[in-house]
Amino acid sequence: MSVIGFGKTAEGALITAAMLSTRITSATVYYNGQSITFGSGHGFDTQPFDDCVCAINAGTILGPLATLINQIYESATDDPSVSTALSGADFTSMKTTSDSQMRRGTIQCEDTKRYLFLRTEAQGTTITIDFGAVWIGGKPRQQPVEQHLEFDV
């Protein structure tokens, strides 16, 4: 995608999975789709980007009620166990049957630490929900699109 205007071309984006589409069936905590029990890593590296979007797709509940707590965490290293929550970057919702939703939030990566994690926590007694999320990173790469020429006539 390119945007032309003001004598510059701005382009550049990357889309990567924050959590692959999965069916959550128990009360658990994930960091970018990985259970913290099974190791660290898989953080979204913000170094190449100026800003990013985290888009969350919570599908239909196949049970009575569940609470999904999604929050963005930041860390200087690719280790979610030492990450801290970003203030105001949370998506908490009560879900009922046939109530699917799509949520998104924009984050200025220049103001955060290097790695971002989507922390997803499912709470409830009978949980079955289809869930997925993506990170979309963007950085304008600016290039001149015009040159001023002068002619001696």
PLM segments and residue spans:
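C-terminal interaction-tip segments
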Residues: 1-19, 123-153
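Short amphipathic, basic-aromatic surface patches that mediate peripheral association
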Residues: 39-44, 55-62
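Extended, low-complexity, turn-rich repeat/linker tracts enriched in Gly/Pro/Ser/Thr and Asp/Glu
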Residues: 59-67, 78-79, 123-128
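Solvent-exposed, flexible loop/coil segments flanking beta-strands in beta-rich domains
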Residues: 1-47
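Exposed aromatic-hydrophobic patches
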Residues: 100-109
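Solvent-exposed serine/threonine-rich low-complexity stretches and specific carbohydrate-binding patches
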Residues: 85-96
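Beta-strand signatures of extracellular beta-sandwich domains
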Residues: 69-73
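Noncatalytic modules at the cell exterior or secretory-pathway interfaces
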Residues: 50-53, 110-127
